[in-house]
């Protein structure tokens, strides 16, 4: 089922820097049939669960999270890099290869009792997704799990996400 999707993801060597092979998902997005197949596959996986909120991780997570939320009848919210959200936020810091990064969430975006799905395009090391998941838990919400278009399994990112459900449509 995902063969057409996999075929549309292209490898771009040495981007954004030498030695990295970037997974370019834009051909998946530009083809309406392939994009629909991806959204439908996400929805099929999560439709049996009561999902109250779907969080999209900046920025490509937004692309998938919004239509998933719509199809599931859930609210959509976003986590962004510091200083990008206009209202009061909470922040979660995570480790990078050299230094640290951070994500922020509006304090009123999710609350106690909400059942939350975190969505991003690619699971690599798990740092960003893990930070988003910790924001969910800090707000007293239930982290249902994570959904990714693709997982770079050789980076072992799923191990960084604890016992939460991890659903990746494709694995590389």
From Swiss-Prot:
EC number(s) stated in the UniProt entry for this protein: 2.4.2.7
A GO cellular component entry from the record: cytoplasm
Entry-linked Pfam families: Pribosyltran (PF00156)
Annotated compartments: Cytoplasm
UniProt keyword terms in alphabetical order: Cytoplasm, Glycosyltransferase, Purine salvage, Transferase
GO molecular function: adenine binding; adenine phosphoribosyltransferase activity; AMP binding
InterPro entries named in the record: Ade_phspho_trans, PRibTrfase_dom, PRTase-like, UPRTase/APRTase
Top-level taxon: Bacteria
Predominant localisation class: cytoplasm
Keyword Cytoplasm attributed: yes
Key word Disulfide bond present: no
Listed GO biological process terms: adenine salvage; AMP salvage; purine ribonucleoside salvage
Pathway membership, UniProt: Purine metabolism; AMP biosynthesis via salvage pathway; AMP from adenine: step 1/1
Subunit structure: Homodimer.
NCBIfam families linked to this entry: apt, PRK02304.1-3, PRK02304.1-5
Family: Belongs to the purine/pyrimidine phosphoribosyltransferase family.
Task performed by this protein: Catalyzes a salvage reaction resulting in the formation of AMP, that is energically less costly than de novo synthesis.
PANTHER family: ADENINE PHOSPHORIBOSYLTRANSFERASE (PTHR32315:SF3)
Protein name as annotated: Adenine phosphoribosyltransferase
Species whose genome carries this gene: Anaeromyxobacter sp. (strain K)
Gene that this polypeptide is encoded by: apt
């Amino acid at each position: 089922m995902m063969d057409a999707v996999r075929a549309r993801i292209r490898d771009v060597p040495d981007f954004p820097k030498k030695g990295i092979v970037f997974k370019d998902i834009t051909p998946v997005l530009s083809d309406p049939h392939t994009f629909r197949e991806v959204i439908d596959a996400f929805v099929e996986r999560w439709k049996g669960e009561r999902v109250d909120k779907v969080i999209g991780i900046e920025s490509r997570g937004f692309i998938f999270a919004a239509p998933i939320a719509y199809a599931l009848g859930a609210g959509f919210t976003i986590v962004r890099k510091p200083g990008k959200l206009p209202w009061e936020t909470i922040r979660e810091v995570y480790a990078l290869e050299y230094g640290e990064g951070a994500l922020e969430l509006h304090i009123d975006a999710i609350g106690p009792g909400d059942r939350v799905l975190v969505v991003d395009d690619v699971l690599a090391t798990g740092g960003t997704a893990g930070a988003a998941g910790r924001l969910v838990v800090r707000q007293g919400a239930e982290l249902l799990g994570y959904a990714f278009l693709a997982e770079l399994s050789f980076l072992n990112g799923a191990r960084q996400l604890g016992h939460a459900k991890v659903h990746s449509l494709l694995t590389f």
